[in-house]
């Protein structure tokens, strides 16, 4: 399968933005607005992340970059060409940014689970030659949970090309005040620019 994107520019590197089931996905439009200034961009939302995107934001994002969803993995299987979307996406990308990275997705990828397009891509990722950047976003108690620490340590041990953008402390969507909010979008974009392989 040929990977197609909107407004392709040979002078830019190729970045995949993964969106997961965290309320911080409401910042996806702002993230895309800033990332497309620096990268050829493809967005892969998990099914739960779509619940946090308004119709207007989804329409805006799809007008600026290509979106691949879980169903695209199965609709584009080509047995004759031996093509798989998650492999084609890996080959296309220079780097992947998962922002926000929910507790659920963090747990999945740190344990090698691959039950959707995004986690299948991560399971097939080339950690030796390509960077993977995660910006976790979750409730404070989820962030401070011992499992989260183990998941982060596991991912960091895989490769020096795995980067974690720690969350920040603020009043969270649920009303709690504490660590767990996704880092500010401009800082995520700057970090991605500076750590792209």
Curated annotation (Swiss-Prot):
InterPro entries documented for this protein? Flavin_trans-like, Flavoprotein
Its lineage reads:
Eukaryota, Amoebozoa, Evosea, Eumycetozoa, Dictyostelia
- Species source reads Dictyostelium discoideum (Social amoeba)
| Catalytic activity as recorded in UniProt | N-[(R)-4-phosphopantothenoyl]-L-cysteine + H(+) = (R)-4'-phosphopantetheine + CO2
Q: Which cofactor does it need?
A: FMN
- What quaternary structure, including any partners, is listed in this protein's UniProt entry? Homotrimer.
Designated name of the protein: Putative phosphopantothenoylcysteine decarboxylase
EC no. given is 4.1.1.36
Keyword check for Phosphoprotein: no
Q: Name one GO cellular component term.
A: phosphopantothenoylcysteine decarboxylase complex
């Amino acid at each position: 399968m040929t990977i197609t994107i909107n407004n392709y520019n040979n002078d830019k590197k190729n970045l995949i933005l993964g969106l997961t089931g965290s309320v911080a996905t409401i910042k996806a439009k702002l993230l895309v607005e800033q990332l497309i200034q620096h990268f050829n961009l493809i967005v892969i939302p998990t099914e739960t992340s779509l619940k946090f995107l308004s119709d207007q934001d989804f329409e805006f994002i799809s007008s600026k970059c290509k979106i691949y969803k879980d169903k695209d993995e199965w609709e584009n299987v080509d047995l004759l060409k031996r093509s798989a979307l998650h492999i084609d996406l890996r080959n296309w990308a220079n780097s992947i940014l998962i922002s926000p990275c929910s507790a659920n997705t963090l747990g999945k990828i740190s344990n090698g689970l691959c039950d959707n397009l995004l986690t299948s891509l991560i399971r097939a990722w080339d950690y030796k030659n390509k960077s993977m950047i995660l910006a976790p976003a979750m409730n404070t108690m989820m962030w401070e949970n011992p499992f989260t620490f183990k998941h982060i340590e596991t991912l960091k041990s895989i490769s020096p090309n795995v980067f974690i953008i720690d969350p920040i402390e603020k009043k969270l969507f649920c009303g709690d005040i504490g660590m767990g909010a996704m880092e500010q979008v401009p800082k995520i974009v700057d970090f991605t620019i500076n750590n792209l392989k």
